[in-house]
Amino acid sequence: MIQIDALPAFSDNYIWLLQDTAKRRCAVVDPGDAAPVEAWLAANPDWVLEDILVTHHHNDHVGGVERLKKLTGARVSGPANERIPCRDLALDEGDEVTAVGVTFQVLAVPGHTLGHIAFFSDQPATPVLFSGDTLFAAGCGRMFEGTPEQMQPALARLASLPERTEVYCAHEYTLSNLRFAKAVEPQNPHVLQRFDDVTRLRADNRITLPSTIGLERLTNPFLRTSATLVKQKADEWKGHSNTTHVAVFAALRSWKDTF
């Protein structure tokens, strides 16, 4: 049994803290800043940080790794095809890594960065996905390094995970993502309801995560490239027909980049 909590960092990052309460051991995902993790460990001195899991190389995800490694000796696991500080275990598609007693499958999800990975496990009572900056709540990451031909299939793969899978992404972008989702599907009742729910949460400065794969299928335009109305909006934006899922995705992403 693990407990998952968010440690806020910077303006909108979340460092995910996985806790094995029985054994007083923990792991963190994407510690862009060491300070929130250090503060938690100081407040919980009988706990041990055993593992640091990294999804990609951007500094807001790895900036705290070196300090935490020095302080705790935690094992650092991250993508094999990217430069990750202090990495002990290089991970690629098909690998597995165990942290706090939970075994995670490593999924290659290129697009945001070329070597980006995600961590999925169906061992907990509810399956969990740590998606980094690939899949966001109601959105997806920008393609800083990859192509639509890489990222759309990566997102479709995540969308095929069990619908009750909890999605732990790395940023609090949900409300702005839903504003875009409303522009794409202004009559989608699931989008409208989620927008209202998230607006209330953010008004109280509350976290909007985790999401679920099921909710993303209903409300995330980047997972809905097969929906007729989504394609129509993408066609309107580009001024021509987008004949493939990749083309629809690329149109949506370019629209979102300027939204």
Curated annotation (Swiss-Prot):
Give the coiled coil ranges. none
**To which pathway does this protein belong?**
Secondary metabolite metabolism; methylglyoxal degradation; (R)-lactate from methylglyoxal: step 2/2
User: Where on this chain does Zn(2+) 1 bind?
Assistant: H56, H58, H112, D133
Family statement drawn from the similarity comment of this UniProt entry? Belongs to the metallo-beta-lactamase superfamily. Glyoxalase II family.
| Top EC category | hydrolase
The EC number on file is: 3.1.2.6
Q: Which UniProt keywords apply?
A: Hydrolase, Metal-binding, Zinc
The UniProt function text for this chain reads: Thiolesterase that catalyzes the hydrolysis of S-D-lactoyl-glutathione to form glutathione and D-lactic acid.
Q: Does the keyword ATP-binding apply?
A: no
Query: What is the name of the gene encoding this protein?
Result: gloB
Record CDD domains: hydroxyacylglutathione_hydrolase_MBL-fold
Q: Give this protein's Gene Ontology molecular function annotations.
A: hydroxyacylglutathione hydrolase activity; metal ion binding
In Swiss-Prot or TrEMBL terms, this protein is called Hydroxyacylglutathione hydrolase
